[in-house]
Amino acid sequence: MSWQAYVDDHLMCDIEGHEDHRLTAAAIVGHDGSVWAQSATFPQFKPEEMNGIMTDFNEPGHLAPTGLHLGGTKYMVIQGEAGAVIRGKKGSGGITIKKTGQALVFGIYEEPVTPGQCNMVVERLGDYLVEQGM
Protein backbone atom coordinates (compact mmCIF):
# COMPACT_ATOMS: atom_id res chain seq x y z
CA MET A 1 0.00 0.00 0.00
CA SER A 2 1.35 3.44 -0.88
CA TRP A 3 1.78 6.11 1.79
CA GLN A 4 -0.81 8.19 -0.04
CA ALA A 5 -3.31 5.34 0.30
CA TYR A 6 -2.74 5.33 4.08
CA VAL A 7 -3.59 9.06 4.17
CA ASP A 8 -6.58 8.75 1.83
CA ASP A 9 -8.06 5.50 3.18
CA HIS A 10 -7.15 5.57 6.89
CA LEU A 11 -6.93 9.26 7.82
CA MET A 12 -9.21 11.20 5.43
CA CYS A 13 -11.97 8.58 5.64
CA ASP A 14 -15.46 8.89 7.15
CA ILE A 15 -15.24 8.44 10.93
CA GLU A 16 -16.93 5.25 12.14
CA GLY A 17 -20.63 5.76 12.71
CA HIS A 18 -20.55 9.34 11.40
CA GLU A 19 -20.87 9.65 7.64
CA ASP A 20 -19.47 12.92 6.30
CA HIS A 21 -17.42 13.49 9.46
CA ARG A 22 -13.77 13.39 8.49
CA LEU A 23 -10.51 15.13 9.28
CA THR A 24 -9.86 18.51 7.67
CA ALA A 25 -6.28 17.58 6.74
CA ALA A 26 -3.79 14.78 7.33
CA ALA A 27 -0.25 13.75 6.50
CA ILE A 28 2.53 11.29 7.17
CA VAL A 29 5.88 13.04 7.54
CA GLY A 30 9.33 11.55 8.17
CA HIS A 31 11.25 12.52 11.29
CA ASP A 32 13.50 14.59 8.98
CA GLY A 33 10.52 16.70 7.85
CA SER A 34 10.13 15.07 4.44
CA VAL A 35 6.48 14.59 3.45
CA TRP A 36 5.71 10.94 2.66
CA ALA A 37 2.06 11.64 1.81
CA GLN A 38 -0.50 14.33 2.55
CA SER A 39 -4.05 15.40 1.85
CA ALA A 40 -4.53 18.29 -0.57
CA THR A 41 -5.59 20.43 2.40
CA PHE A 42 -2.52 19.80 4.58
CA PRO A 43 -0.76 23.13 5.28
CA GLN A 44 2.68 23.98 3.93
CA PHE A 45 4.89 23.99 7.02
CA LYS A 46 8.25 25.55 7.82
CA PRO A 47 11.29 23.45 8.81
CA GLU A 48 11.46 25.24 12.17
CA GLU A 49 7.85 24.22 12.90
CA MET A 50 8.75 20.55 12.31
CA ASN A 51 11.92 20.97 14.41
CA GLY A 52 9.81 22.30 17.29
CA ILE A 53 7.46 19.32 17.06
CA MET A 54 10.35 16.82 17.03
CA THR A 55 11.95 18.62 19.99
CA ASP A 56 8.68 18.33 21.95
CA PHE A 57 8.63 14.56 21.37
CA ASN A 58 12.19 14.34 22.72
CA GLU A 59 11.67 16.96 25.47
CA PRO A 60 7.96 16.82 26.45
CA GLY A 61 6.65 20.25 27.41
CA HIS A 62 8.98 22.14 25.02
CA LEU A 63 6.05 23.59 23.03
CA ALA A 64 3.77 24.34 26.00
CA PRO A 65 4.99 27.95 26.57
CA THR A 66 4.93 29.00 22.89
CA GLY A 67 2.25 26.74 21.40
CA LEU A 68 2.51 24.34 18.50
CA HIS A 69 2.84 26.03 15.11
CA LEU A 70 2.06 24.30 11.81
CA GLY A 71 1.63 26.13 8.52
CA GLY A 72 1.53 29.43 10.40
CA THR A 73 -1.39 28.31 12.59
CA LYS A 74 -0.83 28.32 16.35
CA TYR A 75 -2.37 25.57 18.48
CA MET A 76 -2.46 25.56 22.28
CA VAL A 77 -0.77 22.34 23.41
CA ILE A 78 -3.06 20.18 25.54
CA GLN A 79 -2.37 16.92 27.34
CA GLY A 80 -0.83 14.27 25.11
CA GLU A 81 1.33 11.24 25.79
CA ALA A 82 4.96 12.16 26.50
CA GLY A 83 7.19 11.09 23.63
CA ALA A 84 4.31 9.48 21.70
CA VAL A 85 1.38 11.87 21.05
CA ILE A 86 1.08 15.67 20.89
CA ARG A 87 -2.38 17.23 20.91
CA GLY A 88 -3.27 20.84 20.21
CA LYS A 89 -6.43 22.95 20.25
CA LYS A 90 -7.44 26.05 18.32
CA GLY A 91 -10.99 27.32 18.61
CA SER A 92 -13.44 24.57 17.65
CA GLY A 93 -10.71 22.46 16.04
CA GLY A 94 -7.30 21.07 16.74
CA ILE A 95 -4.49 18.70 15.84
CA THR A 96 -3.21 15.28 16.88
CA ILE A 97 0.31 14.09 16.04
CA LYS A 98 1.39 10.48 16.69
CA LYS A 99 5.08 9.61 16.56
CA THR A 100 6.12 6.24 15.17
CA GLY A 101 9.62 4.81 14.78
CA GLN A 102 10.23 6.61 11.49
CA ALA A 103 7.34 9.02 10.93
CA LEU A 104 4.83 11.46 12.36
CA VAL A 105 1.12 10.93 11.62
CA PHE A 106 -0.81 14.23 11.55
CA GLY A 107 -4.54 14.79 11.78
CA ILE A 108 -6.19 18.23 11.78
CA TYR A 109 -9.90 18.62 12.55
CA GLU A 110 -12.72 21.14 12.86
CA GLU A 111 -16.23 20.67 14.27
CA PRO A 112 -18.31 18.53 13.97
CA VAL A 113 -15.33 16.17 14.37
CA THR A 114 -14.42 15.89 18.07
CA PRO A 115 -10.93 15.76 19.60
CA GLY A 116 -11.55 12.15 20.62
CA GLN A 117 -12.49 11.15 17.07
CA CYS A 118 -9.34 12.77 15.67
CA ASN A 119 -7.23 11.05 18.33
CA MET A 120 -8.80 7.69 17.48
CA VAL A 121 -8.18 7.99 13.72
CA VAL A 122 -4.59 9.26 14.02
CA GLU A 123 -3.49 6.99 16.86
CA ARG A 124 -5.03 3.88 15.31
CA LEU A 125 -2.93 4.33 12.15
CA GLY A 126 0.12 5.33 14.20
CA ASP A 127 -0.18 2.24 16.40
CA TYR A 128 -0.51 0.05 13.29
CA LEU A 129 2.65 1.57 11.77
CA VAL A 130 4.52 1.00 15.06
CA GLU A 131 3.42 -2.66 14.99
CA GLN A 132 4.75 -2.90 11.42
CA GLY A 133 8.15 -1.56 12.50
CA MET A 134 7.60 1.81 10.85
Curated annotation (Swiss-Prot):
Source organism, top-level taxon: Eukaryota
Keywords: Actin-binding, Allergen, Cytoplasm, Cytoskeleton, Disulfide bond, Phosphoprotein
Location of the protein in the cell: Cytoplasm, Cytoskeleton
Key word Cytoplasm present: yes
Protein's recorded name: Profilin-1
Remarks, miscellaneous: The variability of the residues taking part of IgE-binding epitopes might be responsible of the difference in cross-reactivity among olive pollen cultivars, and between distantly related pollen species, leading to a variable range of allergy reactions among atopic patients.
Provenance organism: Olea europaea (Common olive)
Role description: Binds to actin and affects the structure of the cytoskeleton. At high concentrations, profilin prevents the polymerization of actin, whereas it enhances it at low concentrations. By binding to PIP2, it inhibits the formation of IP3 and DG.
